[in-house]
Regions:
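C-terminal outer-membrane/trafficking sorting elements
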Residues: 18, 851-893
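Carbohydrate-active catalytic/glycan-binding domains of CAZyme proteins
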Residues: 20-601
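Short tryptophan-centered beta-strand motifs in secreted/extracellular beta-sheet-rich domains
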Residues: 250, 724, 785, 789-799, ...
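Ligand-recognition surfaces built from glycine- and aromatic
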Residues: 585, 821-852
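Secretory/extracellular carbohydrate-interaction modules
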Residues: 698-768
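Short, aromatic/His-centered strand-loop micro-motif at the edge of beta-sheets
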Residues: 771-793
Length: 893
């Protein structure tokens, strides 16, 4: 394709001519809002399916997962708002049961695996034979229960049967597992046991719930599939792995020729594939498999871990040798079948991550893009393939642990995904994720997938939120011109060797896609668009190593930044066919690296930065020393300072003299800038003015979960004090559903975080799990209602010897006044504390506080005194509209 090479002369002229557009309080008033998603669902190993029998314009989508996890949504909910159904199904009895017996009467889930519908099948010779009843619970290892062992179902509509088919793995110890098929006329059940599809663990070594160890294979379909009359030597082994798979994690799909396939398996022997019978949804026994080692047909003997095809288990397509890799899922997108796998362990520190391979055929070979010819998804020996100590990188890593700054917690251990092309032609990936600081809690997330120029999948940087563009739009339309693309971006790179055991995660850095086609900032390089498309090419130095230049091919799309309504132009890109770099004569493995970029709306980013920035002084303050100036912007915005008199105070905040000085803070992004003047009196001998802050929770609602709704951070130097003023709003459900003040060494969620205290409003220190140091005169009978809407006036002091004290006066809406204090000594005596508020089922808002405004009258403008808008927020003299100065109101035009 012809590339749109940016005109250097015209764009350089544009650079030189670009003026900054000033914005004031009015321009930023409604620049953005935070968003809360209340329909989150916790379904582990989510498999998504569209109800093809219902509405075509707003169809229902279902997800089923392990342990009978289930939920549904309408497409109009953007795959974020889910609702469970048939709650309580896992209890005793049949109330709300998902399952029925062969007589159509509801049965409890534990009894759903005992009696099958199918009585006859065709064997490996095409002969119709009896299909003996197979009790899947009886096949589980002795002592195993059904509850807790129903893993990772996959659901598909069988067009021939005109039934929904659910493929469920009933796991057992010692590989005594079975994948079975249930059928239903409705996606919500009841599901009836159709029959077994494939089972494992028939080595004759392990006792089952319903069968003895010896001769256990006779109770399976092994003879029907292979014609054997005795247990073949390869299965008669003390160590099932690394030859035999564990029959879990099914994925069922149609190929382009309408054949029905199932992939399955996990660590141990790897991922296998068998063909299914469209007439009954079970295994197609007439489709046979040779015994092959390394792709060569040979006489079967003892177990060989290099076997690539087995007469019973089918064709191996990935993994093997006990190497990590499970949760296979195959989805056709465009030209290729894409094989998704989850490497690593599923816990928060386990390193779970999604890898992708592709093939032009449904049964492979599946390869990645990490070499010019691709690395096969199968392994020939054991090797560690995930985490910081990995010995080999394989498979395109879609993304790893990460956190955009609007996210309350970093995503960790994303995996066991499904994928779908929805009713509007948008490819989506559906996965579960764990989170930093949330133990092993997990939730479902959905991102859009795109195909880049080289035919590799790339994931959109943010959650899917109703975006409409498809791969066809990207390939055939230039949705954005060069002037729209140029600007300030946050970027996240997803390395292979992430220290997942330490729960490390990637955070955004700032880069600038300059109008002349260059890239500056954290990484340097160049960029270009591809004419007539929405593809973007980037060459970046520093992503893989300091000196390596890596080429990326990606896609441009507009998205909504997570947990906000802020629009952002995003890129998602992959280093693939030409991504191998050379540095210092050494060849570096840089293929398969995924990167994300996000160019937030400029005004929203400026406003977000202002809301998240704590200036450690007020206009007119007297300072006997200069606190650290905030210089870190957000969402790609930057903060700079300019002194009116560097001989008194430099731009960097270094005190040089004594007297009055004006410090001007400028927050800028993409041609817009906001400025604010602070007139300060610098006097080393004067009593310092206590700074007053008006903190605001990120989410202004009373439904937020614990450790998700934070204020900005506030720095408190040893020997200093600060004041906080805010209103507290609560759902009044529990005493702890109110503000909590935390003190730590750095921002929550950052590596190396050390917590000193967590003072709850209700007389409790969360960190110490004690009320030691808390003193109050609360009336507990009315406490919960008293706190809702209360005004909090708090002073916090921290001494150089580590002594910390908080005193608060709390005024209720009925004018009752409470006094609350907390004191402690921090043994390590840090030179600075990082303070922040966090709320559960509540929020705080200091932005709406009055600022000493008396009854207003209209008079002429005065040029002295502090300016406030009608919301009580301090503004500068460029503000247009009604303002209050010295308690008087006037209109500034």
């Amino acid at each position: 394709m012809k590339k749109l090479l940016l005109s250097v002369m015209s764009l350089m002229a544009m650079n030189g001519a670009m003026a900054q557009t000033a914005v004031g309080e009015n321009d930023l008033a409604n620049a953005y809002a935070t968003q809360t998603i209340t329909g989150r669902i916790a379904v582990h190993d989510p498999s998504i399916v569209m109800d093809v029998t219902g509405s075509t314009t707003n169809p229902k989508y279902y997800i089923y997962g392990s342990h009978l996890g289930r939920a549904k949504t309408y497409a109009s909910g953007n795959y974020q708002i889910w609702k469970t159904f048939k709650t309580g199904e896992e209890n005793a009895g049949t109330s709300n049961s998902l399952f029925a017996g062969v007589n159509d009467k509801l049965v409890n889930f534990k009894d759903a695996y005992s009696t099958q519908l199918v009585k006859k099948v065709k064997n490996n010779k095409g002969e119709e034979v009896d299909f003996p009843n197979f009790d899947a619970h009886a096949w589980q290892a002795k002592g195993n229960n059904v509850k807790g062992m129903q893993w990772a179902p996959d659901v598909i509509y069988n067009k021939t049967m005109k039934k929904w088919c659910m493929y469920m793995s009933l796991n057992g110890d010692n590989w005594c597992s079975t994948i079975v098929c249930f059928i239903s006329d409705d996606l919500e059940g009841p599901w009836i046991y159709q029959g077994p599809v494939v089972c494992s663990g028939f080595s004759g070594r392990y006792a089952h719930n319903g069968f003895a160890a010896s001769g256990d294979w006779k109770n399976t379909d092994l003879a029907i599939a292979t014609g054997c009359t005795s247990l073949p030597q390869r299965y008669n082994t003390d160590e099932w792995s690394p030859y035999g798979p564990n029959c879990i994690d099914p994925c069922v799909f149609y190929d382009d020729d309408d054949n029905l396939w199932m992939s399955y398996g996990s660590w141990f022997a790897g991922i296998f594939m068998i063909k299914l019978d469209k007439e009954n949804g079970l295994r197609d026994y007439t489709y046979t498999y040779p015994y092959q080692v390394k792709g060569v047909t040979t006489t079967a003997g003892a177990a060989d871990a290099n076997a690539t095809s087995d007469p019973y288990f089918g064709k191996k397509i990935a993994g093997g040798w006990g190497v990590s890799g499970e949760a296979s899922y195959i989805q056709k997108v465009g030209k290729y079948y894409y094989l998704f796998m989850s490497y690593g362990g599923l816990t928060a520190a386990g390193g779970y991550q999604i890898r992708v391979f592709r093939s032009e055929k449904p049964d492979g070979p599946y390869k990645d893009c990490l070499t010019s010819t691709g690395i096969d998804a199968m392994y020939g020996k054991y090797i560690l393939n995930f985490g910081g100590d990995a010995k080999r990188d394989e498979g395109v890593k879609l993304f790893g642990n990460y956190q955009w700054e609007t996210m309350p917690n970093a995503e960790l251990a994303q995996g066991h995904n499904s994928a779908i092309v929805d009713h509007k032609g948008r490819a989506l990936i559906v996965y579960h994720t764990r989170f930093l600081n949330r133990s092993e809690e997990h939730e479902v997330r959905v991102h859009q997938l795109f195909v880049n120029q080289d035919g590799w999948l790339v994931a959109a940087p943010y959650e899917f939120s109703g975006e409409t563009y498809t791969d066809n739009d990207i390939a055939t339309r230039q949705l954005y011109d060069a002037t729209e693309v140029a600007g300030d971006y946050q970027m996240i790179a997803h390395p292979y060797r992430q220290n997942t055991a330490a729960m490390d995660y990637e955070k955004p850095v700032t880069i600038h896609l300059n109008a002349d086609g260059s890239i500056s900032g954290e990484y340097t390089g160049k960029w270009e668009l591809v004419s007539g498309t929405s593809y973007i090419n980037l060459t970046l130095k520093g992503v893989a190593t300091a000196n390596a230049e890596v080429k990326f091919k990606g896609v441009l799309t507009e998205q909504t930044i997570d947990y906000t309504n802020i629009k952002a132009l995003c890129f998602t890109a992959l280093s693939s066919s030409d991504g191998l770099a050379t540095s210092g004569g050494a060849s570096l493995q840089t293929r398969g690296l995924s990167i994300w970029g996000s160019k937030a709306d400029a005004k929203a980013a400026i406003k977000y930065t202002l809301d998240k920035t704590s200036v450690p002084f007020a206009d007119g303050a007297t300072l006997n020393s200069m606190p650290k100036l905030p210089t870190e912007g957000h969402l790609g915005a930057t903060i700079s300072w300019k002194s009116s008199n560097p001989s008194i105070l430099t731009d960097e905040g270094v005190v040089k003299g004594k007297g009055k000085v004006t410090m001007t803070m400028t927050v800028s992004k993409d041609g817009y800038e906001y400025t604010k003047d602070y007139t300060l009196n610098i006097d080393a001998e004067a009593e310092e003015t206590t700074p007053v802050y008006y903190p605001v929770s990120a989410q202004k609602n009373t439904t937020s979960a614990w450790w998700t709704n934070f204020s900005a951070d506030y720095k408190l130097q040893a020997g200093k004090k600060v004041q906080f003023k805010f209103y507290n709003y609560s759902n009044a459900t529990n005493n702890w559903c109110n503000w909590a003040l935390y003190g730590a060494n750095k921002t929550h969620g950052v590596a190396g975080y050390i917590e000193y205290f967590g003072i709850r409003c209700d007389n409790w220190n969360n960190t110490a799990n004690s009320n030691v140091g808390c003193v109050s005169n609360y009336v507990w009978d009315t406490f919960k209602n008293d706190m809702n809407g209360s005004l909090v006036d708090m002073t916090v002091e921290y001494a150089a010897n580590g002594a910390f004290k908080m005193t608060a006066t709390i005024t209720t809406t009925s004018k009752k006044v409470y006094n609350y204090s907390f004191s402690t000594t921090i043994a390590s005596k840090p030179s600075q504390l990082n303070l922040f508020f966090v709320n559960e089922g509540s929020y705080i808002d200091g932005s709406s506080l009055s600022t000493g405004i008396s009854n207003p009258i209209i008079i002429q403008k005065k040029n002295d005194g502090k300016w406030f808008n009608l919301s009580g927020q301090q503004v500068d003299k460029s503000y247009k509209g009604v303002v209050i100065v010295n308690g008087k109101k006037f209109v500034n035009k």
